[in-house]
Design a protein with these regions (language model features):
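C-terminal beta-signal and adjacent terminal beta-strands/loops
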Residues: 179-192, 237
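Outer-membrane beta-barrel "beta-signal"
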Residues: 25-26, 202-212, 226-237
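Transmembrane beta-strand segments that form the barrel wall of outer-membrane beta-barrel proteins
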Residues: 2-8, 43-55, 177-183, 212-221
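Repeated loop/turn-to-beta-strand initiation elements of outer-membrane beta-barrel proteins
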Residues: 1-2, 34-38, 76-81, 171-175, ...
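A short alpha/beta connector and helix-capping loop motif
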Residues: 190-204
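Transmembrane beta-barrel wall of Gram-negative outer-membrane proteins
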Residues: 1-20, 24-26
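C-terminal outer-membrane beta-barrel translocator/porin domains of Gram-negative envelope proteins
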Residues: 17, 21-167, 178, 185-186
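Flexible, glycine-rich linker and terminal segments associated
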Residues: 5, 119, 235-237
Length: 237
């Protein structure tokens, strides 16, 4: 999948310039699963390269890479073991681009029913805990680190892994035991296994002709008070 995209966005009152974004993309999606709705064998490889600005023009110039590998194995004829590893990196990002991020969401975010399930959607980092000068006054102060400031905050490097054991139950029901690990950072080299945020939990699925719907319960591996119940359509990956 190769394409060229031009986007223009209406500015908010807070922004003084129009937002114009031009992108050249090259995406590879190889899907060798035996069943896209309920896979038990096979793999998926997703590789994405998006180049913004540069010779194309626009407000911002940077490159975004994303690699996602998913594998599925049948165990004992009944169980399905599924694993995903997803890594992403943005090169050439400038702090000046952050003024558009609340509109475009081009950085990496984690949290929600398909990534870290013990975290609210997109809110592994928020403006209340990201140690970033969100108000642009040159200081990381109380206004930046107010815990009530629940606006999602992204970053330029991401590492995510998900592990699941899926099993059938009576009628159309199914169960999933899972563990999620991930983090986002301004430096990909800091995203080693010791720095990942881990959670674990279980899910109940209802298998429909259009695919499973699920209810997930997950809690943080270190602090059980950090937990979420999430709804999802299809499996997390």
């Amino acid at each position: 999948d190769i394409g060229l995209t031009f986007e223009r966005f209406d500015e908010s009152e807070a922004l003084k310039e129009d937002i114009e974004q031009r992108k050249l993309k090259a995406h590879l999606n190889q899907d060798n699963r035996d069943n896209p709705l309920n896979p038990r064998e096979g793999y998926v490889l997703i590789a994405q390269f998006d180049s913004y600005g540069g010779p194309l023009g626009g407000n911002r110039t940077y490159i975004k890479y994303n690699l996602d590998l998913r594998n599925y194995y049948t165990l004992l004829d009944l169980l399905t073991f599924a694993v995903r590893i997803n890594a992403g990196l943005i090169s050439g990002w400038s702090s000046d681009y952050d003024q558009y991020e609340s509109i475009l969401f081009e950085k990496f975010y984690l949290g929600g029913s398909n990534t870290l399930r013990a975290v609210k959607p997109l809110r592994l980092l928020t403006n209340g805990n990201d140690q970033i000068d969100n108000d642009g006054n040159g200081l990381i102060d109380a206004d930046d680190e107010n815990e009530s400031n629940d606006i999602p905050s992204g970053d330029i490097a991401m590492l995510l892994t998900n592990w699941e054991i899926r099993f059938p139950m009576p009628w159309r029901l199914g169960g999933v035991i899972f563990a999620d690990g991930g983090n986002i950072s301004n430096d990909f080299r800091s995203l080693n296994t010791n720095e990942l945020v881990w959670n674990y939990g279980f899910a109940l699925t209802l298998n429909l002709p259009v695919g499973p719907i699920r209810i997930d319960y997950a809690q943080d591996s270190k602090d059980a008070s950090i937990n979420q119940i999430q709804l999802g359509f299809l499996y997390a990956f």
